[in-house]
Each structure stands twice: as structure tokens, then as C-alpha cells.
């Protein structure tokens, strides 16, 4: 596979994190994993040159119910509009600022299926942005750097377990689906990639916790991940009775389960509400 940054007459732009998927066998496997069907409300983030867009449109789109796509590169937007016409509704802009809820069906029932080969340089902030729309989402399938996927699905007690692990596992059931080698792209990235499936928990399955407070606790815990929690969470020892929670501070951040972090955030919420 050539290392050229040019593909189909378009130069991949580093500032957009562009690496275009070109392996048709991998594309077929990804589409089979997603399982698109007519009438589904699907959004593709960063369609690029349309490698996934075309088979998705073939399986689900009609002029009355098109595939939606969010794309920042205006050169690509023109090409995609010309190629797919009314079967693709393009939304020009940055996915990090896009209101995905605006594409959801009316009512409270989740309706969006979101897919994409996400730009690796913004993957974590984009995942956190998407989490704010999780109640409107049926599922998400993303191509990401393999290291990021491993962190997303990591178990407590492992080196890969991180702030990203806790915050996403609190909100989603996640599964690594496929490995994708660098040679599947043009130009090939310098890292391995993987497909992850993310299914939001339903409202009745979610713990009753303020995600902002959970994020506050988790960020503090992982701020110096080689230090013990008695140091990183030291500022909270006067407000939270860790002994009453059965929470051992003589551990590192990666040794604590999602449920335990939720318990600490709930305790913090109770103290602040009482105060």
C-alpha cells in the first residue's frame, strides 16, 4: 500500500486527522458488524471519500430517509453531494460542536445510530461530546486507534483502565468488535485500529448519579495515577466519609471499579446537598 497522502484525487489533511479506509474486505466486515437496515436513522461522522458511506446508503437510505453525515472538510462535502445526491444529507461542521440530538426522531425513544471512522486526534473529546446525547442513541460503531478501544473496554486493575474507561463504562455497554491493520488505510496510520460497539444503558439501568460530580471525582483520582488515592482524593477526606463507604484509599485509581466511583460521587452529592 502506498504511503501517499493522496487518494482519489484528494490529499489527506493532517489537521483533520484524515486516513481513508480502502480495504474492501475490512469495509464489508464493518458494514456487517453495523447491520444497517432500511428506515433506520443513521449518522456517519467524517464520511471522508465515502468508503463506508456507499455501502451504508445501499442498505438503508431512500430520498425520504437519507443517511446523515457530519463532515468538516468542505472539499469533501462537494464531492459527496455530487456522488450521492438526495440519499445523503450532509451537515457541514465540526462534530465536536454538532448537536446530534437535532437529528433524532421526535419523542423520547432512542432513534439514532451513529457510526464513523473517527479522527484519532480528537477521539476522546468527541466520545465525551457524544455522551451528552446518549439518551437519543440506539448504538454507536466507531473506528478508533486500538489503544483507545483497549482503554474504553479495560477492566479495573489493568494498566489500560483510565478516566475514559470509567466515564464511558458508566454510560455504555461496550465491546471491541474488529481489529483493523494500518495497511487498510490510505495513507496508513502509524497505529493499529479497531472497531468498537457502544450501546447506551437505558434510563432505568443507569445509577442515580450526577455525571458532572462523577467526572470530578474520576478526574481527581486519575490526575496522578501512580499515587495512592489518599493523595489524589485527599481534598475530599473532610467531606466524604470514605470509611463508611468501605472505600479503601490505599489503592491507585486503576484499582477502583466503576460502581465504587459512582458511590463516592453519590456521597459527595449528598454532602453538598445537605450543606
From Swiss-Prot:
Specifically dimethylates two adjacent adenosines (A1518 and A1519) in the loop of a conserved hairpin near the 3'-end of 16S rRNA in the 30S particle. May play a critical role in biogenesis of 30S subunits. One of its GO terms (cellular component) is cytosol. This is Ribosomal RNA small subunit methyltransferase A. GO terms for molecular function: 16S rRNA (adenine(1518)-N(6)/adenine(1519)-N(6))-dimethyltransferase activity; RNA binding. Gene3D superfamilies: Ribosomal RNA adenine dimethylase-like, domain 2 (1.10.8.100), Vaccinia Virus protein VP39 (3.40.50.150). It is found in: Cytoplasm. Keywords: Cytoplasm, Methyltransferase, RNA-binding, rRNA processing, S-adenosyl-L-methionine, Transferase. NCBIfam families: ksgA. The keyword rRNA processing applies. S-adenosyl-L-methionine binds at residues 19, 21, 46, 71, 94, 117. The lineage of its organism: Bacteria, Pseudomonadati, Pseudomonadota, Betaproteobacteria, Burkholderiales. Belongs to the class I-like SAM-binding methyltransferase superfamily. rRNA adenine N(6)-methyltransferase family. RsmA subfamily. Its EC number is 2.1.1.182. Pfam families: RrnaAD. It catalyses: adenosine(1518)/adenosine(1519) in 16S rRNA + 4 S-adenosyl-L-methionine = N(6)-dimethyladenosine(1518)/N(6)-dimethyladenosine(1519) in 16S rRNA + 4 S-adenosyl-L-homocysteine + 4 H(+). InterPro entries: KsgA/Erm, rRNA_Ade_diMease-like_C, rRNA_Ade_methylase_Trfase_N, rRNA_adenine_dimethylase, SAM-dependent_MTases_sf. PROSITE patterns: SAM_RNA_A_N6_MT.
Amino acid at each position: 500500500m502506498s504511503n501517499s497522502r493522496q487518494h482519489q484525487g484528494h490529499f489527506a489533511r493532517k489537521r483533520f486527522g484524515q486516513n481513508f479506509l480502502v480495504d474492501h474486505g475490512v469495509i464489508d466486515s464493518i458494514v456487517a458488524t453495523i447491520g444497517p437496515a432500511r428506515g433506520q436513522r443513521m449518522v456517519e461522522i467524517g464520511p471522508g471519500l465515502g468508503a463506508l458511506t456507499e455501502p451504508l446508503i445501499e442498505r438503508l437510505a431512500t430520498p425520504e430517509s437519507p443517511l446523515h453525515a457530519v463532515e468538516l472538510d468542505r472539499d469533501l462535502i462537494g464531492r459527496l453531494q455530487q456522488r450521492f445526491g438526495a440519499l445523503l444529507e450532509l451537515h457541514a461542521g465540526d462534530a465536536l460542536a454538532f448537536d446530534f440530538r437535532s437529528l433524532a426522531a421526535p419523542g423520547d425513544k432512542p432513534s439514532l445510530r451513529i457510526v464513523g471512522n473517527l479522527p484519532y486526534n480528537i477521539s476522546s473529546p468527541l466520545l465525551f461530546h457524544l455522551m451528552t446525547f446518549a439518551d437519543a442513541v440506539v448504538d454507536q460503531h466507531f473506528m478508533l486507534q486500538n489503544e483507545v478501544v483497549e482503554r474504553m473496554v479495560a477492566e479495573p486493575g489493568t494498566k489500560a483502565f483510565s478516566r475514559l474507561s470509567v466515564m464511558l463504562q458508566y454510560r455504555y455497554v461496550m465491546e471491541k468488535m474488529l481489529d483493523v491493520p494500518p495497511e487498510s488505510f490510505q495513507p496508513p496510520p502509524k497505529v493499529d485500529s479497531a472497531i468498537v460497539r457502544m450501546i447506551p444503558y437505558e434510563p432505568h439501568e443507569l445509577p442515580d448519579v450526577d455525571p458532572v460530580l462523577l467526572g470530578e471525582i474520576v478526574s481527581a483520582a486519575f490526575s496522578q495515577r501512580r499515587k495512592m488515592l489518599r493523595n489524589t482524593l485527599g481534598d475530599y477526606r473532610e467531606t466524604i466519609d470514605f470509611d463508611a463507604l468501605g472505600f479503601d484509599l490505599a489503592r491507585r485509581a486503576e484499582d477502583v471499579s466503576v460502581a465504587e466511583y459512582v458511590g463516592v460521587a453519590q456521597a459527595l452529592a449528598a454532602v453538598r446537598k445537605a450543606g
